[in-house]
UniProtKB/Swiss-Prot annotation:
SUPFAM superfamilies: Glucocorticoid receptor-like (DNA-binding domain), Homeodomain-like. It comes from the Eukaryota. InterPro entries: HD, Homeobox_CS, Homeodomain-like_sf, ISL1/2-like, ISL1/2-like_LIM1, Znf_LIM. GO terms for molecular function: cis-regulatory region sequence-specific DNA binding; DNA-binding transcription factor activity, RNA polymerase II-specific; metal ion binding. Signal peptide: none annotated. Residues 307-317 have a biased composition (Low complexity). It comes from Oncorhynchus tshawytscha (Chinook salmon). Residues 318-340 have a biased composition (Polar residues). GO terms for cellular component: nucleus. The keyword Protein biosynthesis does not apply. Residues 172-231 bind DNA. One of its GO terms (biological process) is positive regulation of transcription by RNA polymerase II. This is Insulin gene enhancer protein ISL-2B.
Length: 340
């Protein structure tokens, strides 16, 4: 905190009277003895990198060790030149990107799964699934085959198979109606809008399709029956999938494909703050006075003149009289306006 231009140390909270003030971006000021790493107590200045986190200052080494990204396998940090592999939010060294069972290194293009933060190649993941599901009544392979059977057309239109032979007199000839694409499209559109059409809608369908009312009635009955069976079957599959997933005890991982290694970016660590050295304006005059043979009374008058800030209010004759008492200054020293 600053009070009327007075520099206050962030570390100890007292006013800074030192020769140097260390300023940490954006507006933090420290004693030179107070600005040090909170972990290793290394003094920090403008010659090293300083990090500030949660009000504490750290050197670069400790900041990377505490807050830097580490390999999910060996728990060691990365260098700026390291190539890394990523799986979800985990980052790995290329040498650490291996199957946790067979230790085979995964290369770009390999399929793998991430289970309990462990990498598994496709072969080992399949073996674990087979072992875990060995005692279950329905294996994952059977579930897949059943789900594939849903897409197959249901053979409702096929004539039923007779196990016994009827007499010739008992046989009845039934005409099988074959619907074309236009008729099917019309019936399906109406079914999606209303699975149970009323008499008026059925009459309109008779005119639009050219089918008999009986055929239309039977088609809607069969369609509702098939949809009901399909809904029940899907519900049973979901329940069985939930049971198998519980029996696997978390062995189901997320299938992934290894990508190409990328260069590790150190910018995730955050931008280091800048430490600047501040030197009061009278310091240069003080050092010059110690190295030169100056008239001490005249020098004290000059210092008090610069500290009082009355240079702008003094007359030109006073400045001339003071400067005449000083020896010739080197050409490298260029006067600049004083800070107030």
């Amino acid at each position: 905190k600053k009070k009327s231009g007075i520099a206050m140390c962030v570390g100890c909270g007292s006013q800074i009277h030192d020769q140097y003030i260390l300023r940490v971006a954006p507006d933090l000021e420290w004693h030179a003895a107070c600005l040090k790493c909170s972990e290793c107590s290394q003094y920090l200045d403008e010659t090293c990198t300083c990090f500030v986190r949660d009000g504490k200052t750290y050197c670069k080494r400790d900041y990377v060790r505490l807050f830097g990204i580490k390999c999910a396998k060996c728990n060691i940090g990365f260098c700026s030149s390291d190539l890394v592999m990523r799986a979800r939010d985990n980052v790995y060294h290329m040498e650490c990107f291996r199957c946790s069972v067979c230790s085979r290194q995964l290369v770009p293009g390999d399929e793998f799964s991430l289970r309990d933060e462990e990498l598994l190649c496709r072969a080992d993941h399949g073996l674990l699934l087979e072992r875990a599901s060995a005692g279950s009544p329905i294996s994952p392979g059977n579930i897949l085959s059943r789900s594939f059977h849903i897409a197959d057309p249901v053979s409702v239109r096929q004539p039923p198979h007779r196990n016994h032979v009827h007499k010739q007199s008992e046989k009845t000839t039934r005409v099988r109606t074959v619907l074309n694409e236009k008729q099917l499209h019309t019936l399906r559109t109406c079914y999606n809008a209303n699975p149970r059409p009323d008499a008026l809608m059925k009459e309109q369908l008779v005119e639009m399709t050219g089918l008999s009312p009986r055929v239309i009635r039977v088609w809607f009955q069969n369609k509702r029956c098939k949809d009901k069976k399909r809904t029940i079957f899907m519900k049973q599959l979901q329940q069985q999938h939930h049971i198998d997933k519980t029996n696997l005890q978390g062995l189901t991982g997320t299938p992934m494909v290894a990508g190409s290694p990328i260069r590790h970016d150190n910018t995730v660590l955050g931008n280091p703050v800048e430490v600047q050295t501040y030197q009061p304006p009278w310091k240069a005059l003080s050092e010059f006075a110690l190295q030169s043979d100056l008239d001490q009374p005249a020098f004290r008058q000059l210092v008090s003149f610069s500290e009082s800030g009355s240079m702008g209010n003094s007359s030109g004759s006073d400045v001339t009289s003071l400067s005449s008492q000083l020896p010739d200054t080197p050409n490298s020293m260029v006067p600049s306006p004083m800070d107030t």
